[in-house]
C-alpha cells in the first residue's frame, strides 16, 4: 500500500468512521426498506398503517441530513486539512533530508510541484469518494445478504457480473498522457515566443501554428474520449442487461412487488458500487504512480550530522578536489590558501572556470562527502569540511530565484523581524532610496520594479540579513551583474565596509571590471578548475 495512503488512513478520526457507518446504514438500508414497505402498503391498499412507516422514513431522512450538515462534512473538512498538511510535511521532510546541491536541483524540477498537486487532489478525491459514496457499499452488502437469504437462485446470475466489474475496475484508460503533454508543450513554446514572432512580422504564421496545435489537441482528446466512452457504456450496458434479465426471472418465480422493488434497486446499487470501486481504484493508481515519481525525484538519503563551529579566526585549505559527476571537469586546489576574518577575497576567472562550484563548497551546499579535503579551522582539522560553518555564513547565489509579487518590506526582511532602523540602513547602503523610501517600503510591490531596481532590492535584503545574523563568512556570487558600473562600485564598497567593521570574511566573484579593481585583501585566480 502507498505510504501516503497509509499516512491518510492514520488521519481518519473515529467520529468520521462512526458517522459514515450510521449514515450508510440509514441511507442504504433503512430508508430503502421503509420505501419498499410503504410501496407494498399502497399496492395492498393498506392505508391505515401507512402513517407509522412514513413517519419513520421522514425521521431517518432527517437523521441522515443532520449528520451530513453538522458532523460528516465537519469531520471530512478536518480530514482534508490534515491530509493536505500531512502530505506537505511528508514531502518537506524528504526535501530537508537531501544534500543542498541535490535540493537545489529538486526544487527547480517542475515535475515535483506537478506530482505533489496530483497526489494531494487524488488523495482528497479518494477520500471524497469513500466518504460520500460509502452508502453504496453498505447497500450492496445489505441487499446481497437479503438476496442470498430470500432469492439464492437469482444471486447466481449476479455472479456473472463479477468478471465484468473486475474488468471495469482494472481497465486502464487508453489515453497516453505523454501524447497530450507533447502537444501541449508545443503550444506553450509557441505561445511563450509569440511576441518575438509578432514584432518580426511573423504574427499570422505563429498564430496559425497555435490554432493548428489546439485543433490537434482537441482531435486527439475527442478520439480518446469517444473510445473510452464506448468502453464505459458497453460495461454499463452489460450490467443493465444482466440485471434486467434477473428481474424477468424474479417476476416469473415470485411476482411480488416488494421483491421486485428490491431486485430493481439492487441493479442500480450494483452499478453504483461498481463505479465506486472503479473510481477509488483509479485514484489509488494515480496516487501510487505519483508517489513513485516523488520517490524518484526525492530519493531517501541519510545525511550525516555535522558538528557546527560557532566561531573561528582562520581557515587553512591545504587540499581540495571536487570532481563533477556528469562531466570530466575537476576542481582542484593548486597550493594551500589561508583565509582570515575581516578579509575581502575576490575569486577571479573567466566564466566556466569553477568559481560558483568553489563557492558552493565553501557555503556547504556541496556536502563534504562529495569532495576530498584537508581543511583546518583555527589549526584544528575538521572532518566535516566547510559544512561545519553552515550556521556562520550567508550565501547569495548568482541565479537565485525570487518571488517578486511581494511588498518590498516583506521581501527585504524575509523571516527576520522588522526593524525600521536596519531597514533604513539597508535601503541607504543598497542605493534604493531613489525608488523606495522607508515610508514607501510597505506599499511598494517588487514586481513593478525594473531589473536594476530588483538587483538593488536583493542587495538590500542581503545587507539586512548581514546586520541581523552577523555571520562570520559572506559569500557573494556576482551580485553586481544587474547593476550599472557606478552603482555596482558604490554598493560593493558599502558591503566591504560592513564586512571589515564586523570582522566578516567576504568571498566574492564580480562581473564588473571596475568592481574587480577595488581594494581586495586577496585575489584567488581560477583557471579551468585550478584554484590558485
Curated annotation (Swiss-Prot):
What organism is listed for this UniProt entry?
Answer: Acanthamoeba polyphaga mimivirus (APMV)
Which residues are involved in binding ATP? 349-356
Q: Tell me the ranges covered by the ABC transporter domain, including all copies.
A: 315-531
> What residue ranges are annotated as transmembrane?
11-31, 51-71, 126-146, 147-167, 231-253
One Gene Ontology cellular component: membrane
User: Which SMART domains does this one have?
Assistant: AAA (SM00382)
Q: Which terms does the record give in the GO molecular function aspect?
A: ATP binding; ATP hydrolysis activity
Q: Which InterPro entries match?
A: AAA+_ATPase (IPR003593), ABC_transporter-like_ATP-bd (IPR003439), Metal_Ion_Import_ABC (IPR050153), P-loop_NTPase (IPR027417)
Record's protein name: Uncharacterized ABC transporter ATP-binding protein/permease L733
Top-level taxonomic group: Viruses
Query: Membrane topology for this entry?
Result: Multi-pass membrane protein
Where does the protein end up? Membrane
Key words, A-Z: ATP-binding, Membrane, Nucleotide-binding, Transmembrane, Transmembrane helix, Transport
The question of whether Zinc-finger is a record keyword is answered with: no
Amino acid at each position: 500500500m502507498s505510504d501516503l495512503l497509509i499516512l491518510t488512513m492514520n488521519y481518519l478520526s473515529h467520529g468520521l468512521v462512526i458517522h459514515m457507518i450510521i449514515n450508510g446504514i440509514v441511507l442504504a438500508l433503512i430508508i430503502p426498506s421503509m420505501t419498499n414497505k410503504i410501496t407494498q402498503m399502497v399496492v395492498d391498499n393498506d392505508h391505515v398503517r401507512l402513517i407509522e412507516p412514513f413517519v419513520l422514513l421522514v425521521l431517518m431522512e432527517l437523521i441522515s441530513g443532520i449528520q451530513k450538515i453538522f458532523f460528516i462534512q465537519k469531520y471530512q473538512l478536518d480530514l482534508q486539512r490534515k491530509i493536505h498538511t500531512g502530505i506537505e510535511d511528508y514531502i518537506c521532510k524528504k526535501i530537508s533530508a537531501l544534500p543542498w546541491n541535490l535540493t537545489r536541483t529538486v526544487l527547480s524540477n517542475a515535475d515535483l510541484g506537478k506530482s505533489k498537486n496530483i497526489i494531494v487532489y487524488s488523495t482528497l478525491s479518494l477520500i471524497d469518494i469513500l466518504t460520500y459514496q460509502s452508502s453504496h457499499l453498505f447497500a450492496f452488502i445489505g441487499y446481497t445478504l437479503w438476496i442470498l437469504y430470500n432469492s439464492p437462485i437469482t444471486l447466481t446470475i449476479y455472479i456473472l457480473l463479477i468478471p465484468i466489474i473486475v474488468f471495469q475496475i482494472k481497465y486502464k484508460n487508453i489515453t497516453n498522457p505523454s501524447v497530450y503533454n507533447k502537444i501541449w508543450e508545443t503550444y506553450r513554446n509557441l505561445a511563450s515566443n509569440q511576441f518575438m514572432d509578432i514584432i518580426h512580422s511573423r504574427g499570422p504564421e505563429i498564430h496559425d501554428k497555435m490554432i493548428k496545435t489546439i485543433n490537434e489537441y482537441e482531435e486527439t482528446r475527442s478520439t480518446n474520449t469517444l473510445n473510452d466512452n464506448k468502453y464505459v457504456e458497453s460495461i454499463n450496458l452489460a450490467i443493465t442487461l444482466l440485471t434486467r434479465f434477473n428481474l424477468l426471472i424474479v417476476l416469473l418465480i415470485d411476482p411480488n412487488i416488494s421483491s421486485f422493488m428490491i431486485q430493481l434497486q439492487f441493479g442500480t446499487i450494483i452499478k453504483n458500487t461498481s463505479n465506486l470501486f472503479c473510481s477509488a481504484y483509479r485514484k489509488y493508481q494515480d496516487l501510487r504512480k505519483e508517489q513513485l515519481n516523488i520517490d524518484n525525484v526525492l530519493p531517501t538519503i541519510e545525511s550525516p550530522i555535522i558538528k557546527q563551529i560557532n566561531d573561528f579566526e582562520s581557515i587553512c585549505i591545504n587540499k581540495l578536489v571536487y570532481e563533477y559527476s556528469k562531466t570530466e571537469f575537476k576542481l582542484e586546489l593548486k597550493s594551500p590558501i589561508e583565509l582570515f576574518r575581516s578579509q575581502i577575497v575576490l575569486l577571479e576567472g573567466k566564466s566556466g572556470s569553477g568559481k560558483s562550484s568553489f563557492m558552493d563548497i565553501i557555503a556547504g551546499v556541496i556536502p563534504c562527502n562529495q569532495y576530498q579535503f584537508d581543511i583546518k579551522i583555527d589549526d584544528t582539522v575538521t572532518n566535516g569540511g566547510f559544512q561545519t560553518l553552515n550556521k556562520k555564513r550567508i550565501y547569495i547565489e548568482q541565479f537565485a530565484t525570487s518571488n517578486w509579487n511581494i511588498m518590498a518590506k516583506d521581501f527585504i526582511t524575509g523571516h527576520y523581524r522588522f526593524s525600521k532602523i536596519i531597514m533604513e540602513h539597508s535601503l541607504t547602503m543598497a542605493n534604493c532610496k531613489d525608488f523606495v523610501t522607508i515610508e514607501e517600503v510597505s506599499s511598494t510591490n517588487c514586481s513593478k520594479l525594473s531589473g536594476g531596481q530588483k538587483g538593488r532590492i536583493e542587495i538590500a535584503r542581503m545587507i539586512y540579513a548581514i546586520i541581523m545574523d552577523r555571520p562570520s563568512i559572506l559569500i557573494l556570487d556576482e551580485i553586481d551583474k544587474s547593476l550599472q558600473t557606478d552603482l555596482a562600485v558604490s554598493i560593493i564598497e558599502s558591503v566591504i565596509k560592513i564586512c571589515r567593521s564586523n570582522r566578516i570574511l567576504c568571498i566574492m566573484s564580480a562581473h564588473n571590471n571596475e568592481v574587480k579593481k577595488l581594494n581586495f585583501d586577496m585575489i584567488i585566480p581560477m583557471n579551468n578548475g585550478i584554484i590558485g
